[in-house]
Amino acid sequence: GRKVYPDFASLPEKIDLAVVIIPAEAIPGVLAEGAEAGLRNALIYASRFGEGGDDVGAERAAELRDICDRTGLRISGPNCMGAISLPERLLFYPTSRVRGLPLGSVGVVFQSGGTFQFWLEQGAARGLGYSYAVSSGNELDLDMADYINFLVDDDHTRVIACMAEGVSRPDALMAAVERAFEADKPVLMLKVGHSAAGQAAAQSHTGALATDHHVFTAMCRKFGVVPVDTLDALIEMSLAFSAGRLPHGDRVALVGYSGGAKGLFLDIAETDGVSMPDFTPETQAVLREHIDAGVPTSNPLDTGAGLARRFPEFAEVAKIVAQDPNIDMVSVQGQLPLAEGTAGDPDLFRQIRDSTDKPVVAHNRMSQNINDAGRAFQAAAGIPFLQRLPEVATTLKALAAYAERRRRGIPPFAADKVSLDPDAAVEDVLAGHGISGPKSAFASNAAGVGDKALGVGFPVAVKIVSPQAVHKTEVRGVALNLASPEDAVAAAQAMSDRLLAAEPGAVVEGFLIQQMVDGLEVIVGVRDDPQFGAVLALGIGGVMVEAMRDVAFRLLPVTDEDVGDMINELRAKAVLGAFRGAAPRDVDALVAAVVGLSNSWPALQDRISDIEINPMMVGAEGEGVVAADIRSLSRDQN
């Protein structure tokens, strides 16, 4: 038996860690006593510390925070499932199911306890090995940022896999993932809460503030964090990133012996935006010598059924493909054996890998059961065997995106070369960064609109200016293509009458008269997010953007390349080209304007919390862009 002590004071020496397995209501008193006796670390399994709006639990959590602040005690949890240290073979976990996990290079941080255990088991079954793994729970004290920082400094860890439900300290998290990026330790992040219901569930589970999914993804892109959508994908990506190779580009080759798989992957590649270029003529000529007559030498490559049973020849074909200068990553068809010695030679896969410095993975068309024989085969082959073609596409895209972010680095704000009065109008700040509006004038009443319109030049647009007409289209406060002074006056008077009829107390400050500008309507804006800072949004469609939700997001600052990526993410990006007889749009001018808005933010951020240009009119190539409507929200208004 083991000797039991009644309290901390009775212990013969100070302890490093207290694993707390007592009711929640007793924990603050016990840990206060322990801290006074020299306890410095505690792990708390219990819940009821404020999750889901529990007031009594919140008071209990506040008591624990006070103990931490007064004594320096560090707490993991509460509401967690413990931690595992594979290098030291230490297990602080309430069940024995995770015993025997293999040592490896993946560090794991999950806020969810039950999912944590399940994912560790499934990852190990797929051949993942772990350094450290922690279920962070409510993160009352230590949080995901702390654990990521620890893993960045740990020599055993090469990849960090995370599942986040909420964010306790956004600034600390950004600093931690930036350190990981600088150390070339990829952080793979599965974030719960894409939907409003998912955000509410995450908040009630951990008590942490659930952030907007688009903003969180923008944070990931800025700091090289790899966003992940499913638990399965987190395993596939952990395997691929653990292999340690990054591509020089995003071009993928698929080598297999199934025509059906070839067609399926082409569908997936088109949907997911996977680049699959043709092989060079030289490569195709060499391939023709190795594959069956009549089999196309195109990418994806179906070598024909004959090579399915002649794997040394199949491996030679894969090596040829891997040498093609048009290709950055190679996936070869392969299924793990269910029994030792039943199929294949793992050394042939290793030879394919060793023939190139490009990432090489194997792919299975569907998920399969993987046992000890399969794991041993994968280890001997030296490459990850990815399951299911959609995960293959997602994983290879993620490798390319991470490599591209490493090439670009994390952009700083450009030094502002524009000298402006700190109290300059928002429009003047934007103009200093190359963003200007159409010729315009202001009339304080409807009667004066006609003369002002003459000065601007017809046709004109007239817009009501009123605190009660922020979204002008919703109150019919915009009139377009007015061709005479009389039309302009009548339109102004009509929109004023409509607003006052709908809201008798409304204040009509006047009317903005603008020269009509042709072009494609785009929305671009910046919002100061309370968690992650300034967020840029770019979308196509003007007033339709809210209905279509076709918007890309980034954290500031952005570069020309970042804006190009944002444009490519838009579903309606085709309208910027030669679309249905229209001339191609001035994309270069649009990119320059969006970067200009990004660069203007440091001069504006102390005064305003939001700025929106909607619409920004994008002219034909060479015609530039015009900010047709600029709206900002001062920090006093927010």
Where are the predicted features?
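Catalytic-core regions of core metabolic enzymes
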Residues: 1-638
